[in-house]
């Protein structure tokens, strides 16, 4: 019984490890978008990529259009 509990704890920690690691390198920042009140998702992705990742769209994880700005989650360039 004790080995099963230890194995279960190890298994759960193994499952949560990738989420913990990815949350450590993900950066949240915003970029002003004065052209529109609420930008399209594609416009936000392009604006975030241009400002934070030197135009690399693959490093943008998610964007959220807000009032005259875009909130970006991205992997920083090294």
Curated annotation (Swiss-Prot):
Keyword Lyase included in the entry's annotation: no
Organism: Scolopendra mutilans
Reported tissue expression: Expressed by the venom gland.
Residue numbers marked as site, Important for inhibition of KCNQ4: 69
GO cellular component terms, A-Z: extracellular region
Disulfides per UniProt: 44-70, 48-72
Keyword entries, A-Z: Disulfide bond, Secreted, Signal, Toxin
Record carries keyword Secreted: yes
Subcellular location: Secreted
Name of this chain's protein: U-scoloptoxin(15)-Ssm2a
Coiled-coil region list: none
Domain of life: Eukaryota
Family: Belongs to the SLPTX(15) family.
Signal sequence annotation: 1-23
Domain characteristics, as noted in the entry: Has the structural arrangement of an alpha-helix connected to a beta-sheet by disulfide bonds (CSalpha/beta). Since the toxin contains only 2 disulfide bonds, it is called 2ds-CSalpha/beta.
Renumbered residue ranges of the record's region Important for inhibition of KCNQ4: 34-37
GO molecular function terms attached to this record: toxin activity
């Amino acid at each position: 019984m004790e080995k099963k509990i230890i194995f279960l704890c190890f298994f759960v920690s193994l499952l949560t490890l990738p989420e913990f690691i990815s949350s450590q390198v993900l950066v949240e920042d915003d970029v002003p978008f004065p052209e529109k009140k609420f930008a399209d998702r594609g416009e936000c992705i392009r604006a975030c990529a241009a400002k934070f990742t030197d135009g690399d769209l693959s490093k943008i994880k998610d964007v959220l259009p807000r009032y005259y700005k875009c909130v970006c989650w991205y992997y920083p360039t090294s």
